[in-house]
């Protein structure tokens, strides 16, 4: 903010606030009338012209007012670093709703998205925990043909991953049962990443060479869990709220948006970058900062949630660059905290 005077910054933030509220280009008379700037419309107009020249505002038509650029929105968002917290009543309502969702919903991630979309008035995105951080509940082997087993990995969240693995020697039913029992004890309470590490350590232990059954169990387990990367589910709810935006009245722009939401590569990349920020951090990607997602017309506000004491997945709001950041940022922050709390209780 060092390149702006206090007066210029005050006028710029008033322009951003008005644009967020109305979605319309902002004129000097509106700012003079509504924001108590103690300046004439002519003085404000001169400052707006300077802000436009500095890259903070854009005038779509010479006769129209001005709209904030991504640079102005970023400046405004950074000034909101002290998030406005939800009221105790709002926080209690949020926690109670998530307790209901995780206690009874068949698809809690989707229900979370629907609820957040409703609260924010924008689209909501929820990413399931990354594979290596997801707890494994069961590991089973099913003989399919000589020299081959089907490994079935059942995660604690109910998702399943299957893969075929080759075996050098036939395994009878009794031996397979003992292997299942042994691996059940080993994987209990551990994530996929922890289980992979455990198998590697056990197989490197020379003392295991004399225990043929245990060694075979860990060899099968290692094969079954190696490179298993069930794609983390990314739920998007409230897409219609994006489609209905005037920013996407243009058909070609709308087609690009729908393609981006369907393929989700840009979105997944942004969510991964949010994970890297760590717990308790709300990350905002404004317009062009979100890459090709939304053609520069959208912003993503996202935060990680925790599971098993680790950063696991992300939750966020996807909306127009003129979204109400002062409302959405604390809402996303509180949602991530509520998800962390509830997921720690519901297994």
From Swiss-Prot:
Keyword Zinc-finger: no
Molecular function terms from GO: DNA binding
GO BP annotations listed: negative regulation of DNA-templated transcription
Keyword Transcription: yes
Keywords: Repressor, Stress response, Transcription, Transcription regulation
Disulphide bridges: none
Pfam families assigned: HrcA
InterPro entries per UniProt: GAF-like_dom_sf, HrcA, HrcA_C, WH-like_DNA-bd_sf, WH_DNA-bd_sf, WHTH_transcript_rep_HrcA_IDD
PANTHER family, per the entry: HEAT-INDUCIBLE TRANSCRIPTION REPRESSOR HRCA
Family to which the UniProt record says this protein belongs: Belongs to the HrcA family.
General function of this protein: Negative regulator of class I heat shock genes (grpE-dnaK-dnaJ and groELS operons). Prevents heat-shock induction of these operons.
Record-given protein name: Heat-inducible transcription repressor HrcA
The organism of origin for this protein: Sorangium cellulosum (strain So ce56) (Polyangium cellulosum (strain So ce56))
Gene that this polypeptide is encoded by: hrcA
């Amino acid at each position: 903010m060092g390149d702006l005077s206090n007066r210029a910054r005050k006028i710029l933030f008033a322009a951003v606030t008005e644009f967020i509220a109305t979605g319309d280009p902002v004129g000097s008379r509106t700012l003079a009338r509504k924001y108590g700037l103690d300046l004439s419309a002519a003085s404000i107009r001169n400052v707006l012209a300077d802000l436009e020249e500095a890259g903070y505002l854009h005038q779509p038509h010479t006769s129209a007012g001005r709209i904030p650029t991504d640079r102005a929105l970023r400046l405004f968002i950074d000034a909101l670093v002290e998030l406005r917290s939800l009221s105790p009543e709002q926080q209690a309502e949020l926690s109670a709703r998530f307790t209901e969702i995780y206690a009874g919903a068949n698809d809690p991630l989707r229900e979370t998205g629907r609820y957040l979309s409703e609260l924010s008035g924008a689209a909501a995105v929820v990413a399931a925990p990354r594979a290596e951080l997801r707890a494994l509940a069961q590991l089973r082997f099913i003989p399919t043909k000589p020299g081959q087993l089907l490994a079935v990995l059942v995660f604690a969240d109910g998702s399943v991953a299957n893969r075929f693995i080759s075996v050098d020697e036939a395994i009878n039913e009794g031996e397979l049962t003992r292997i299942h029992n042994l691996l059940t004890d080993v994987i209990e309470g551990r994530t996929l990443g922890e289980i992979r590490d455990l198998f590697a350590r056990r197989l490197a232990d020379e003392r295991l060479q004399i225990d043929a059954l245990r060694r075979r169990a860990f060899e099968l387990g290692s094969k079954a869990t190696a490179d298993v990367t069930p794609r983390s589910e990314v739920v998007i709810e409230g897409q219609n709220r994006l489609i209905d935006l005037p920013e996407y009245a243009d058909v070609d722009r709308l087609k690009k948006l729908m393609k981006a939401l369907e393929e989700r590569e840009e979105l997944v990349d942004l969510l991964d970058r949010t994970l890297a920020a760590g717990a308790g951090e709300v990350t905002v990607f404004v317009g062009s900062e979100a890459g090709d997602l939304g053609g520069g017309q959208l912003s993503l506000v996202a935060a990680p949630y925790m599971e098993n004491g680790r950063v696991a997945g992300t939750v966020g709001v996807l909306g127009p660059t003129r979204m109400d950041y002062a409302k959405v940022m604390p809402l996303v922050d509180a949602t991530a905290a509520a998800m962390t709390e509830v997921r720690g209780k519901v297994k």
